[in-house]
Amino acid sequence: MGRHSTKTSSAFTKLAASTIAFGAAATIMAPSASAAPDSDWDRLAQCESGGNWAINTGNGYHGGLQFSASTWAAYGGQEFATYAYQATREQQIAVAERTLAGQGWGAWPACSASLGLNSAPTQRDLSATTSTPEPAAAAPAVAEYNAPAANIAVGSTDLNTIKSTYGAVTGTLAQYGITVPAEVESYYNAFVG
């Protein structure tokens, strides 16, 4: 094209260029819908049930996310337990992900709105028949450590603190389906007598 020739553009070319530019800008500026992280479910449970995943309020809603029996059954909850409060936190979250995929965050209207929840559902694969994880192919070597003996008198407040702390830790682990290794139990029992 010559230097002094007039440039012409068709209306179609202008429209196409505008559409592509607008689409690119919208894609870049749109918030991404990431998967619902566990922290969202924990926040929702805190709002719905005070964070108690095993709650049975007696009002027809159960578990940390306050499932009705019909919603629990409709989204496959009975694969894990009859009612949500009888299922683990992870199982309740798996059913919640299915509920989220089917109903959106409107299944928990007040709390999801007040918390600003908007993430997309995530498929979680939990099997009701698999209650314990598969053993690892090869366990790493255990380093031996002989700790110096502590001088704590039986009945002292230090020993009571150890007992209460150990009880709290094992109780929390049990809520998540984690058992304390036998070696740790035997060390603890040998220590506290």
Curated annotation (Swiss-Prot):
**Subcellular location, principal:** secreted
For this UniProt record, the keywords arranged alphabetically read as follows:
Hydrolase, Secreted, Signal
What EC class is this? hydrolase
Q: Looking at the keywords, is Secreted present?
A: yes
Concerning Pfam families, the annotation shows: Rpf1_C (PF11574), Transglycosylas (PF06737)
Where is this protein localized, as stated in its record? Secreted
Q: Name the Gene Ontology molecular function terms of this record.
A: hydrolase activity
Q: Mention any one GO cellular component term assigned to this protein in its UniProt record.
A: extracellular region
Q: Does the keyword Repeat apply?
A: no
Q: What EC designation does it have?
A: 3.-.-.-
Any idea what a deletion of this gene does? Not essential; a double rpf1-rpf2 disruption mutant is also viable. The double mutant displays a prolonged lag phase and slower growth after transfer of long-stored cells into fresh medium.
InterPro entries linked to this entry = Lysozyme-like_dom_sf, RPF, Rpf1_C, Rpf1_C_sf
Q: Which domain of life is it from?
A: Bacteria
Leader sequence residues: 1-35
Family per UniProt? Belongs to the transglycosylase family. Rpf subfamily.
Q: What does this protein do?
A: Factor that stimulates resuscitation of dormant cells. Has peptidoglycan (PG) hydrolytic activity. Active in the pM concentration range. Has little to no effect on actively-growing cells. PG fragments could either directly activate the resuscitation pathway of dormant bacteria or serve as a substrate for endogenous Rpf, resulting in low molecular weight products with resuscitation activity.
Recorded protein name is: Resuscitation-promoting factor Rpf1
Q: Which organism is it from?
A: Corynebacterium glutamicum (strain ATCC 13032 / DSM 20300 / JCM 1318 / BCRC 11384 / CCUG 27702 / LMG 3730 / NBRC 12168 / NCIMB 10025 / NRRL B-2784 / 534)
Report which gene this protein is encoded by: rpf1
